[in-house]
């Protein structure tokens, strides 16, 4: 499992400040994973510089501690760590949570550019459907631990089929077109200890 982690699949957690060690310099946190996987020390040091260039941070910032970086820079640093061993798959768990919309946009553009340049795949986990249309080719909608709908991104946004997907689509405002009243999803999430039979969403179907 250790050989698999970071070399075949890596993860970007939703809170960069919590994901980073507060008492280690960023440089050490990037090189640590490479050294653990047998990369030569000098090669790891150069790779850390290259990774910071890649994610748009001045290499001089490698000697900073996490609290000395802005939220957007910390998120980029976490992405750099995740890419240290060039994994073909990157899991991103709410990578733009707690960032303002301008920084969110910059991070998403950075991720898209890196994916084009390096050719890795992304499993992007989020509750914000507006982010998915920016970055995804295919989308799976989960409710209470089950995938209730999956489709190509454009198809899902233009013609959602499942009532839960429709509820999600109606619960956030559109930035274009006529004004529409936002509609919440009635009811409460199910008790997963004793879930309803059949589709777990059926007690909330309107």
Regions found by a protein language model. Name each.
Residues 65-69, 73:
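Conserved ABC ATPase signature
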Residues 55-58, 62, 152-206:
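Short catalytic/signature loops enriched in Gly
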Residues 1, 28-43, 56, 68, ...:
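ABC-type ATPase nucleotide-binding domains, specifically the catalytic core motifs of the NBD
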Residues 5, 44-48, 62, 169:
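Short amphipathic alpha-helix in the helical subdomain of ABC transporter nucleotide-binding domains
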Residues 17, 23-35, 45, 49, ...:
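Short helical segment in ABC ATPase nucleotide-binding domains corresponding to the A-loop/adjacent helical element
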Residues 2-3, 7-14, 78, 123, ...:
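ABC nucleotide-binding domain signature
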Residues 87, 91, 95, 99-181:
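P-loop NTP-binding/switch modules centered on Walker-like glycine-rich loops
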């Amino acid at each position: 499992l250790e050989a698999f982690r970071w070399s075949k699949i890596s993860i970007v957690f939703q809170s960069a400040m919590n994901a980073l060690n507060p008492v280690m310099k960023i440089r050490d946190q990037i090189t640590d994973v490479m050294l653990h996987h047998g990369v030569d020390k000098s090669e790891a040091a150069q790779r850390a510089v290259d990774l910071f260039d890649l994610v748009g941070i001045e290499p001089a910032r490698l000697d900073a501690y996490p609290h000395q970086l802005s939220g957007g820079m910390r998120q980029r640093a976490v992405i750099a760590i995740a890419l240290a061993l060039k994994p073909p798959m990157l899991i991103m768990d709410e990578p733009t949570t707690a960032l303002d919309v301008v920084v969110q946009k910059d991070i998403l553009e950075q991720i898209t550019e890196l994916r084009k340049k390096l050719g890795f795949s992304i499993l992007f986990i989020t509750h914000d459907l507006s982010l998915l249309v920016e970055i995804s080719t295919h989308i799976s909608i989960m409710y209470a631990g089950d995938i209730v709908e999956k489709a190509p991104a454009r198809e899902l946004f233009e013609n959602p089929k499942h009532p839960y997907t429709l509820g999600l689509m109606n619960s956030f405002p559109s930035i274009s077109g006529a004004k529409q009243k936002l509609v919440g999803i009635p009811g409460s999430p199910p008790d997963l200890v004793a879930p309803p039979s059949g589709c777990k969403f059926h007690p909330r179907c309107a």
